[in-house]
Amino acid sequence: MKNKISYLNDDRHTIKRVKRSNPILFIKTPYSREAMKKKYFKFYLIHGFTTGYISRSGTLENKKKNLSFKKSKKNLNSYLNSLNKDGADQVNDENVQNEENDENQENDENQENDEYEENYDDEENQGNDEYEENESVENHFESDSEKGDFEEMDQTWKTNEKDNEKSDNNDNGDENNEKTKPNQQLQFIGLHRKKENQDEDSNKTKEIEQQQQNQKQQQVNDEDCSSNKQSNSFSGNVLAFGNMILKGLSFSDLTGNNNNNNINNNNNNNNKNNTNTNYTNNVVVNDNICEKDKENTQDQQTNTVTVSTTIINTTTTSTTSENSNTIDKSNDSINESGISSLDESNNSTSGDLISSNSSSFSSMDDI
């Protein structure tokens, strides 16, 4: 029994007894009749927050004074009345004051514990084990009046327990009523799940409609982009020392040289090595392009445009170079004014270089 911690639990209360080397009990709530009958709790029902230790006669020792059973009973009645009225665990002012006093006197009590422990151990050595086995709650009554007070208190507990049982039965009755109507519950569950399925189908329908709408919008955007390309076809003049006007491209002020590109032309069975003349062309941009064409803007800015013209008798070779890619075109005619024109439809030249609306481009690869 020495240096042992004892715990007692029931459905509403927890009681802790610390080891006997420091025999102080912390009693926080009133506990049931079954708990009172345990042999290692040799004290009567004490209500409130109380600190102390137990004497061999079964009374709670606190400041070397015995707390009378009547006082503890009075506190218990106040507690039970508060439960009946408010339905909550309330502690009266007297017990709160007792708790404060106990906390202030804790050091004094600890000093008394050593002396008490010695006396307690002496009593245990004098056949206390046999006494504890045969003891009962009645053995601790010091008088008939005290026993009567206990029976009255016990009856109070029984009355309150009956009230609690009635309350529990009412709760069980409500549960039984619910069990007698399973169809209503099943009907509610069915309606709830049906509503969930309807909501899920509605969400799927909305998602499909949104996808269709996005596809239609994308198709319209593609058509607008294609139409925009056709309207931005090449139209302008290319002069030997002039300006090149381009529409539908996303770069401007582009200059380029076709340096040291040699073109071999056979004319009248004579091999002649002709060096192209370099020109600088100013590019004027009409920034009217589609969104997806703008993705190639950075790549287009690295391209160069060079227009070179070589006149050999009546034969002109026009070369367009893009990133060292050379395209030779022969048998193109040039007039005396030095203005070269190219018709994309029949590869003939006369005057201005004008393309039809059917040809369009958005990058230098189309030139």
Swiss-Prot record:
> Residue ranges under compositional bias (Polar residues)?
332-347
Note down the stretches annotated as region Disordered.
Answer: 97-231, 316-367
Compositional bias (Low complexity) at which positions? Answer: 210-219, 316-328, 348-367
Q: What is the protein's given name?
A: Uncharacterized protein DDB_G0290803
**Which stretches are tagged as biased composition: Basic and acidic residues?**
137-150, 159-169
Q: Where is the composition biased (Acidic residues)?
A: 97-136
Its domain of life reads Eukaryota
